[in-house]
Amino acid sequence: MDVYPPRRQGLPRARSPGGSSRGSPSVSCSRLRQVQSILTQSSKSRPDGILCILGIDSRYNEGCRELANYLLFGLYNQNTSDFEKTGFSEEVLDDVIILIKSDSVHLYCNPVNFRYLLPYVAHWRNLHFHCMTENEYEDEEAAEEFKITSFVDMVRDCSRIGIPYSSQGHLQIFDMFVVEKWPIVQAFALEGIGGDGFFTMKYELQDVSLNLWNVYSKMDPMSLESLLSDDLVAFEHQWTSFFANFDTEIPFLLELSESQAGEPFRSYFSHGMISSHITENSPNRQPFVLFGNHSTRENLNAGNFNFPSEGHLVRSTGPGGSFAKHMVAQCVSPKGPLACSRTYFFGATHVPYLGGDSKLPKKTEQIRLLSQIYAAVIEAVLAGIACYAKTSSLTKAKEVAEQTLGSGLDSFELIPFKAALRSKMTFHIHAVNNQGRIVPLDSEDSLSFVKTACMAVYDIPDLLGGNGCLGSVVFSESFLTSQILVKEKDGTVTTETSSVVLTAAVPRFCSWLVEDNEVKLSEKTQQAVRGDESFLGTYLTGGEGAYLYSSNLQSWPEEGNVHFFSSGLLFSHCRHRSIIISKDHMNSISFYDGDSTSTVAALLIDFKSSLLPHLPVHFHGSSNFLMIALFPKSKIYQAFYSEVFSLWKQQDNSGISLKVIQEDGLSVEQKRLHSSAQKLFSALSQPAGEKRSSLKLLSAKLPELDWFLQHFAISSISQEPVMRTHLPVLLQQAEINTTHRIESDKVIISIVTGLPGCHASELCAFLVTLHKECGRWMVYRQIMDSSECFHAAHFQRYLSSALEAQQNRSARQSAYIRKKTRLLVVLQGYTDVIDVVQALQTHPDSNVKASFTIGAITACVEPMSCYMEHRFLFPKCLDQCSQGLVSNVVFTSHTTEQRHPLLVQLQSLIRAANPAAAFILAENGIVTRNEDIELILSENSFSSPEMLRSRYLMYPGWYEGKLNAGSVYPLMVQICVWFGRPLEKTRFVAKCKAIQSSIKPSPFSGNIYHILGKVKFSDSERTMEVCYNTLANSLSIMPVLEGPTPPPDSKSVSQDSSGQQECYLVFIGCSLKEDSIKDWLRQSAKQKPQRKALKTRGMLTQQEIRSIHVKRHLEPLPAGYFYNGTQFVNFFGDKTDFHPLMDQFMNDYVEEANREIEKYNQELEQQEYHDLFELKP
């Protein structure tokens, strides 16, 4: 349980309006891995780390800021006013230093910006925070000194450092002396707290800007979201402006020039190119608008940035100087990968049905011919895109495109012209990076780039017998592909692909009426159907806001006005003008509204082939089918029900009546169209005042987008294969069948992990004692006498032996016991939990692997044992709480005090790293709630769909054991020493309690943080279990409980090699040495007596001399001496305070003392003394 209510993940932060969101942890980790890949390239000159310094400390270097924004999803794309909203100065928020190493990250920040950065970085693997506490940060001088020492510590193990010197489009000549002038780099040379010398002399610096630009140019889910919500919106806006030019100039359309028509594209491109600092002269990346016969191959491939002159008008660019029949247009994003080209028409591509047989005039036939060629080109390009998405082969895509073009021409009965047209056709696909640069299609990174597929049919002759050239037809789309590698049951690897056409929402078909007689014909059509004696019968109702859909996959719905008559309907559009559908042309007409007022009402029209000449060419589909969608709550929706519905249900002279159908009566194609209309209605009907989501609207326009985003979220993370059985779960198509997931005969593994001193062992003992009735328990603990915390090979051998032991039992017992057996894995050390998972996944025996399954992983956290100093965490502290792996986090101290600051702070940190984890309070490992115990002993938490998907996204390659967990930093050593002699309890306790005062700051070398083991003290015969936690300064000495122990214990292997030594202590600390540990421990044992040195007169103390005098001053005096009561006097009158024979007395004393010393030394030599680590005989 949480100490406080679970907060929504992510803390408030300043962010520019409309800026990118916080981003998903998987994309964040993927971006970090992309940057780290620069450090793992097979190059002798590759750097050991990439240094990113923000703010004034790097003199606001743009390259560093760009890298930070890439990793932090644009957090520092803010202006001054945004920073002011936070209440903190820019200098405080920019106070960040990031050092990226190949398998870890060091991050310096301050307590203020820590909370802004945390949601972005908490899930990074092997993350090391260099940050002060709030109280420490109040001392400005200490804070500055801490920053310098942190910077020195961060780069200590490097020799070659990469600098992101330049930002994209602003390449600068790298100058390490400029870097040396950066304030924090200058401070590196300070005496006392600095790094003992100049930074640029101690480290080799190199510019990694170009490497990073290649990383930035790759598409991932976040950059795709930005592309869709920002770049694509701006791109489509240019087309909207382009259409507006034509729609407003309809009365004067013939006088419109190419230059005027292309003004939106030209301004958009030229202004963007100026600000992008990118020079791209490829003709494929140039905008253009060309009318009629001016759209020749020569003009299209000229690559000239300037638009043609004002002299090329619609009026004069057709065959023989007549008006143009069509135009080709291309818009190009100047700072992004988007580009698409279209062919639009001047004049009607169809003749409205007016009740009799109407023949197309010759000029309309030319337009119809061009539109049919164009429709075939569109189909060919889309077929080529689909083929390329599946095969990644340009050659195959070109073949498919050419075949599709041929079959398209056949379908329009253009067989006589096929040979002439195919000889003038070209098809190509270009890959474009995020900055709009064309890159090789066959490069290894091309999968992550947007591509543009284009087909052009150049210089089309007047195929209807006229002279001259009609011009060219061009169509292109920007698309993105996604490819997931899938591992089948037999071990083979196949691919699952998906693609989305990004520019598909730009109208593919459009036409404008330019000649007076065409406009008059359109007006005549409107008047004819509204007349009293109209062939469509009586006018019923009409209105705007209807959408016309066709079965043609290449066309999009057209919004227009619909007018209903007793014998048909009229759909009018501002560009396509009138489309008349009489009941005489209908085979049937159905109606579907889902019996709900929130469902789009759909008129489903199955029409006869005789209607085709009276439909625009893009409404010709594989099946003769149209759908008119009426949105709920619209006026036309209500009018249809009141004026049309009842009347049309009655059969008239045509024999056609409206048939109401249910959902099961819809064909697959009809369901697809209705679903698309429903999504569009949902996107357009946001509540008043709520900003319409551009992504939601785009998703309605691009039905395949939602599926592609799911697919791309998986494929963009890594090219490691996904298991076939897991793929539906990853794509959120299905959930794992729980009855299938945990088979009854599998042994459930419950993993409890944590740092030393986290009370994981106590929790383990509690669980085993409490749940003996659940069946048989096996307990695995890590090997103690090893420098590594976890041995995968040892764990795998243990699993094999445990399974073998079960199989050796009788069949009846085995069936019972295997159902009841649980394995509790207790790992108390600096173990990365992913290593344990991968050890099971990569077990060499597939039968063993199949016999065990992980139920849940629980991490124990002792708040007092998390920080080495300040907010610098112990190694693997956050990694032991990783999302996708760990289901529960148990806090084992400070749980009795309400909202203890340390506990709250750690919960906030871990919640950012693992938002889905359950928090459990268990003082000293004792769980008090039944529901918490159920969480820890869960049988399926680890294998839930959410956890499985998170594992694949966060740890690519985990299933096959390919993920490198990274090294432990700082290096923590685990030294186990065995001995057979008792310790002196008082000396041992005193030595332990003195450790805390000797703890050294970074780099922490020689620090002892934990002592644990089993020993005997000289005052008792009982074996005692001791545990000492240095940071908490807590020492526990408890008798070892006698009784059966969980079989088999891994320590038995170690004991065999230790002979008769039955006591051991494990010392855990930083860069410890065994000799030093043994010397420390010897001082806790009974000390070996030392030989006494023989005395000399010079060694006698004044006290000893006085004692000798007092003892012998009454002895007889030699001749010539007498005692006067106070002094000794000779016959010469000399006086002395001491007896005249004092020298003899002292010699006698020394001689006697030396006899005693010699006797003592002789007895000492005869005594047998054993060193603490000496084996017993």
Swiss-Prot record:
The UniProt transmembrane annotation reads none
Which residue intervals make up region (Disordered)? Answer: 1-27
Which residue ranges have biased composition labelled Low complexity? 11-27
Superkingdom as given in the UniProt entry: Eukaryota
> Which Pfam families does the record match to this protein?
CobW_C_DAAF9 (PF23319), DAAF9 (PF25203), DAAF9_2 (PF25204), DAAF9_N (PF23281)
Q: How does it assemble?
A: Interacts with ARL3.
**Role description:** May act as an effector for ARL3.
Entry protein name: Dynein axonemal assembly factor 9
Q: What is the lineage of its organism?
A: Eukaryota, Metazoa, Chordata, Craniata, Vertebrata
